[in-house]
Amino acid sequence: MIQPQTYSNVADNSGARKLMCIRVLKASNRQYAHIGDVIIAIIKEAVPNMPLKESEIVRAVVVRTCKELKRDNGMIIRSDDNAAVIVDQEGNPRGTRVFGSVARELRQLNFAKIVSLAPEVL
């Protein structure tokens, strides 16, 4: 579960390293974001000499959370960290690589490009 003021890692090579969530999209009073949700975040830590800079406001898709995700078949998916992939307005990833595993639910939520870049799909 990611709420405003939550720090998360960036799971791509766009140049950012840490994000801080400032808003959960898709609902007016929704408090938490789960896997597959789009958030608005601020870049808190970035790699030098890259296109994305610190204190820049970006959109990101949550790909891993510490809070478990329960599937209909009884499987539970849990990660060691909160991670997100930075996307543009159309939902395409800004980076060219995705690090770490992503959940299969992203494919059903029309983030197939993120799933195709990921090395492991759970």
From Swiss-Prot:
Instruction: State where the protein is found.
Output: Plastid, Chloroplast
Keywords tagged on the record: Chloroplast, Plastid, Ribonucleoprotein, Ribosomal protein, RNA-binding, rRNA-binding
Question: Which InterPro entries does the entry link to?
Answer: Ribosomal_uL14 (IPR000218), Ribosomal_uL14_bac-type (IPR005745), Ribosomal_uL14_sf (IPR036853)
**Listed GO MF terms:** large ribosomal subunit rRNA binding; structural constituent of ribosome
Report the GO terms under cellular component. chloroplast; cytosolic large ribosomal subunit
Q: Which CDD domains match?
A: Ribosomal_uL14
Gene3D superfamilies (alphabetical): Ribosomal protein L14
Task: Keyword check for RNA-binding, yes or no.
Answer: yes
**Domain of life the protein comes from:** Eukaryota
Q: Which SUPFAM superfamilies match?
A: Ribosomal protein L14 (SSF50193)
Q: From its record, what is one biological process in GO terms?
A: translation
| NCBIfam families named among the record's database cross-references | rplN_bact (TIGR01067)
Assembly, in brief, is: Part of the 50S ribosomal subunit.
Per the record, the similarity remark reads: Belongs to the universal ribosomal protein uL14 family.
The role this protein plays is: Binds to 23S rRNA.
> What PANTHER family does the annotation carry?
50S/60S RIBOSOMAL PROTEIN L14/L23, LARGE RIBOSOMAL SUBUNIT PROTEIN UL14M
This protein's name: Large ribosomal subunit protein uL14c
Q: Which organism is it from?
A: Cycas taitungensis
Question: Could you tell me the gene encoding this protein?
Answer: rpl14
